[in-house]
Amino acid sequence: MNINTDIFKIQSNNVMPSRGKILISEPFLHDVTFGRSVVLLVDHTEEGSMGLIINKPLPLMLNDIIKEFKYIEDIPLHKGGPIGTDTLFYLHTLHEIPGTLPINNGLYLNGDFDAIKKYILQGNPIKGKIRFFLGYSGWECEQLIQEIKENTWIISKEENTYLMNEDIKGMWKEALGKLGSKYETWSRFPQVPSLN
């Protein structure tokens, strides 16, 4: 019996990492932090790369750490990565916030936190507008390129507009589905095949 194992090989789409690109982990990556993750690259230079894992919620709310938010609706926190886990990052669509770093497609990183707090405390919408993270993901010079060559990641050339969607549990599958039918097969592969 011949089994076609090519369905699990990444076919390079010749997309190079850059700010605003999306990294999608391959299905066999058995890593607590990066397994089945979708990472938004917020910076990529010769010195290294920085990203935020978009689809890993934390069992903690922003309201638990920002006292001014104690009496408003819960604001979820996400695990941005294993580095600087005591540092808050925020991805948003609010171009008017001073000091933001434009990512692309209307997404911005950080900016004046007092302006963000004011926006929230005025009762403005948070869902689909702002996502908060503790920590970030980082790669040293050439480390990410090497991991891509080793087929740990595929870089999506799709727009990152779905990254602010609320359904983060299905985001890895959604990101794979945007890559075409070959990768859609990956999305149906069980996380722990031996338990199937």
Curated annotation (Swiss-Prot):
One Gene Ontology term, aspect cellular component: cytosol
Matching InterPro entries: AlgH-like
Annotated organism of origin: Bacteroides fragilis (strain ATCC 25285 / DSM 2151 / CCUG 4856 / JCM 11019 / LMG 10263 / NCTC 9343 / Onslow / VPI 2553 / EN-2)
Lineage, top ranks: Bacteria, Pseudomonadati, Bacteroidota, Bacteroidia, Bacteroidales
Gene3D superfamilies assigned: VC0467-like
Xref: Pfam families: DUF179
Spans through the membrane: none
Name of protein: UPF0301 protein BF2109
Superkingdom as given in the UniProt entry: Bacteria
Entry's family note: Belongs to the UPF0301 (AlgH) family.
